[in-house]
């Protein structure tokens, strides 16, 4: 849930021009039977994670929706749906000129990779398609990321950023292709 909150903030708000100091979030949990102690424990851990994100980014969760009792009975006992967390967000764009897209804008522009990366392939499409079963799942450093987001926003509002794209599905190669194809 922490990484999901992070992705919403980074990919859907900050990258396109929202002020990182003026964002809000909404949560949606889809889970199995909360009367099952293990399932209730999963909910507690999810809530702890999004509370950490809300504190770190000073981004309140102002509303949400919870969908529980998503399970079914079988001869072998109940089966809960996998825990699913959806984070939606909104941000303040102080100047419409600061809203940018993800496609490459000008030839001979410099491309920068910002942020910190680790060997974290767990849960990725690459890991799934290449049989990597023991990869580390992505972690996030909220405090470091917030400082990065503020620096990025400063560059953006100074007119130094022409376009931006998150690196998620498919990594750097897919991101570069998406930026090139969409322009």
What label would you give each PLM region?
Residues 75-84, 94-116:
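Acidic/histidine-enriched ion/cofactor-binding microenvironments in catalytic or ligand-binding pockets
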Residues 10-19, 103, 110-111, 162-179:
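Conserved phosphate/anionic-ligand binding catalytic regions in large, soluble enzymes, centered on
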Residues 1, 84, 123-139, 156:
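Gly-rich Lys/Arg/Thr-decorated short loops/hinges at beta-loop-alpha junctions or inter-strand turns
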């Amino acid at each position: 849930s922490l990484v999901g909150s992070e992705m919403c903030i980074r990919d859907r708000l900050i990258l396109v021009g929202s002020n990182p100091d003026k964002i809000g979030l909404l949560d949606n949990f889809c889970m199995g039977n909360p009367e099952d102690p293990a399932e209730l424990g999963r909910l507690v851990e999810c809530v702890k994670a999004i509370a950490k994100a809300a504190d770190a980014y000073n981004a309140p969760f102002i509303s949400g929706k919870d969908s529980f009792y998503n399970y079914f009975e079988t001869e072998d006992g109940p089966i809960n749906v996998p825990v699913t967390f959806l984070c939606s967000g909104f941000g303040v764009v102080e100047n419409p000129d600061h809203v940018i897209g993800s496609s490459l804008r000008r030839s001979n522009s410099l491309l920068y990779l910002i942020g910190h990366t680790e060997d974290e392939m767990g849960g990725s499409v690459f890991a799934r398609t290449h049989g990597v079963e023991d990869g580390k799942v992505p972690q996030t450093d909220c405090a470091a990321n917030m400082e990065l987001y503020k620096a990025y926003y400063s560059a953006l509002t100074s007119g130094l950023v022409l376009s931006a794209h998150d690196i998620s599905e498919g990594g750097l190669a897919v991101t570069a292709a998406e930026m090139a194809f969409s322009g």
